[in-house]
């Protein structure tokens, strides 16, 4: 009970923002999946439904269908609905207190999927022999809370990906955390 109750208590504002953008069933499904992944970080999609029914997560977020196939379909639909995702991100960004700092950072994640058109060989990945995607995200430094995230092709230049990320998510202030893939001329 404790872990699920704690997760619910610190994420109530996220549920409120989700309910403003998504249908109630979808918002509860997002929160159920997120809560289960927090409580059990290594949980697989096949076990998620079982743990959902065995924990208080089903009491907090009722009506979530969490079979492995349903989760996959739901997450694909969620990821493809760019307008709602953008509306949710804008609500989260608007909630950031003016005195707080926003960090914009990115990382490369291995992804050798044959069906993902974002998977590509980055500069470093060519030596390793695996494809990657570039995940960019913005978060509030003071409260250590994510604001938004977006996936880019693994072979894209950091400067162009960051510019598109900032433009797409209408980020007006922030600190860019960059590395050697970001030319000094682009860091204005």
Segments and roles (model prediction):
Residues 17-18, 120-122, 159-160:
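Active-site-adjacent structural elements in folded domains
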Residues 111-124:
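Flexible, glycine/threonine-enriched loop-and-boundary segments that flank and lead into catalytic domains
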């Amino acid at each position: 009970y404790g872990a699920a109750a704690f997760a619910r208590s610190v994420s109530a504002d996220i549920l409120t923002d989700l309910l403003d953008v998504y249908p109630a069933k979808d918002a509860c499904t997002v929160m159920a999946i997120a809560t289960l992944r927090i409580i059990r970080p290594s949980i697989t999609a096949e076990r998620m439904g079982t743990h959902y029914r065995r924990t208080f997560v089903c009491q907090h977020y009722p009506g979530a269908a969490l079979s492995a196939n349903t989760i996959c379909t739901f997450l694909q639909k969620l990821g493809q609905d760019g307008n709602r995702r953008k509306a949710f991100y804008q609500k989260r960004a608007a909630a950031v207190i003016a005195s707080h700092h926003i960090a914009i950072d990115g990382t490369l994640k291995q992804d050798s999927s044959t069906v993902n058109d974002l998977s590509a060989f980055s500069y470093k990945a060519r030596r390793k022999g695996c494809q990657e995607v570039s995940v960019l995200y913005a978060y509030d430094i003071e409260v250590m809370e994510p604001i938004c995230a977006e996936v880019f092709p693994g072979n894209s230049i950091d400067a162009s990906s960051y510019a598109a990320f900032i433009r797409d998510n209408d980020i007006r202030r922030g600190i860019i955390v960059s590395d050697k893939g970001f030319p000094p001329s682009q860091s204005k």
